[in-house]
């Protein structure tokens, strides 16, 4: 016969439940005005309220009086401008209990105070010290100059990039093609362009081109681009000794010795 063994019972862990202890409170709900301090935003558990649109000549004692009806108030702080010393038109009211702060927020929001309609919301943070407010105002005053420098640098870089940008290659290419491939006007009365270029290439690449170029001032050219000698050369050669120099059309010299009868 098997013995009956009761199920194993694990003792509760410390800090969560157990004898004589209550479970932990639920997390606060999101939004304004929930249980336990009026919302689950950061800093709502400290019981600080932000009061906007208060008169500039309002004193902390005057603002403390209507809020003390909901519970004990720890502090009332009215921020002032660091340079001018004038109030900035809003205040922080900090309660001892966060629940009292939630009740005051629901009751005092959109109420009339000193002839003005005030707005009461749960502060996202506790009130700042004067040193923190001083640093914040300095950073705000420096922002416009920095933004101007950034915008100036941006416009300068854009102008430099525009000035350094090359021209469009398509336009230059089209202009070059229009100039290089346009046919030249045909001359009247002369030989065609192709024949003249062919004759020029024959003359320029002939072996005796250098000699022909040296004697170019003393030669005449006819219509068929043939080079002929002037009559003065033959008479002069006969006087010198009967030697006649005949020149070929290609520009090379060939000497023939003629013996005159004596």
UniProtKB/Swiss-Prot annotation:
GO function terms (MF aspect): identical protein binding; mRNA binding
Positions with biased composition (Gly residues): 31-42
GO biological process, one term: RNA splicing
Modified how: Phosphorylated.
Segments of skewed composition (Low complexity): 1-14, 243-262
Pfam families associated with the record: RRM_1
Residue ranges with Basic and acidic residues bias: 125-152, 217-239
Compositional bias segments (type: Basic residues): 153-167
InterPro entries noted in UniProt: Nucleotide-bd_a/b_plait_sf, RBD_domain_sf, RBM, RRM_dom
Major location (coarse): nucleus
Subcellular location: Nucleus speckle
Translocase keyword on record: no
Assembly and oligomerization: Component of the spliceosome. Interacts with RS2Z33, CYP59, CYP63 and CYP95.
Function: Involved in intron recognition and spliceosome assembly. Probably active at the 5' splice sites.
Further information: The splicing pattern of the pre-mRNA is regulated in a tissue-specific manner and by development, and changes in response to various types of abiotic stresses.
PANTHER family registered for this protein in UniProt: TRANSFORMER-2 SEX-DETERMINING PROTEIN-RELATED (PTHR48034)
Protein name as annotated: Serine/arginine-rich SC35-like splicing factor SCL30
Species of origin: Arabidopsis thaliana (Mouse-ear cress)
